[in-house]
Amino acid sequence: RRMKEIPAAELSSDRPSTDPAQDLFGHAPFARTLAKAIRGHRGSDGIVLALYGPWGSGKSTVLAYVEHELEYGPEAERPVVVSFNPWWFSGQENLAKAFLGQLQAVLPAKYKGFEKVGNLIAEFSGALGGVADLAGKSQGIPLLGKLVESGAKRLASKPKDVPALKKALSGLLLTEKKRVLVVIDDIDRLAPDEVRQLFTVIKALADFPYVTYLLAFDREVAV
């Protein structure tokens, strides 16, 4: 029996579109407007933006388009983008440590002025309960485990003053005046306790200067 041929256009995957030029569902204009708003924000205050929608509504595609738009903007206005997918770390003992470890690894790697920021994030992570060993658990960031391990060794004999570390980290961000965009997707795929843990750490870090959070999730599932 001859099998029916299926046109390629009818096939799709769970992977989001990443190029606005290939936009089939009209997400690009909204993503462009959102990227422009993020790039144009001149204040030093931290911002948290949320993109709500059910599964399959195009949230991940919008996030990808926003990152694409920001990459091709004026260099002086480009934020340092850190993408974090908590679903990769789902089931780990401490999701918050994975998130801080990602920031620690990515920020200095993408912007030289953030080397001290990365060190302070390691100390801040340690002050919140010890640095987790994340070696080999961060996709696409092979240095993450080594960075966190070295941070743990430095913190072994140091007193941990969370308010002082937070103040020092805020001071460095104010000095650099470089906007950071933290993109977090697939929050609604986490277990309820993991969602609470992630939102708790975001709340604790939301007031850092020059840091913008862009979150995507199904509000009916994650909240």
Describe every region a protein language model picked out:
Residues 1-89, 97, 205:
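Walker A/P-loop-proximal flanking segment of P-loop NTPase domains
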Residues 45, 110-114, 213:
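Short, flexible/disordered secondary-structure transition segments
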Residues 4-12, 76-78, 102, 143-144, ...:
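Non-catalytic regulatory/linker segments of enzymes
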Residues 62-64, 94-95, 192-196, 223:
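A short acidic (Asp/Glu
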Residues 63-175:
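P-loop NTPase nucleotide-binding core
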Residues 161-220:
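Conserved Walker B catalytic segment
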Residues 47-49, 115-116, 183:
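Short coil/turn segments at secondary-structure boundaries
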Residues 20, 24-28, 52, 56, ...:
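Conserved phosphate/pyrophosphate-binding and hydrolysis machinery centered on Walker-type P-loop NTPases
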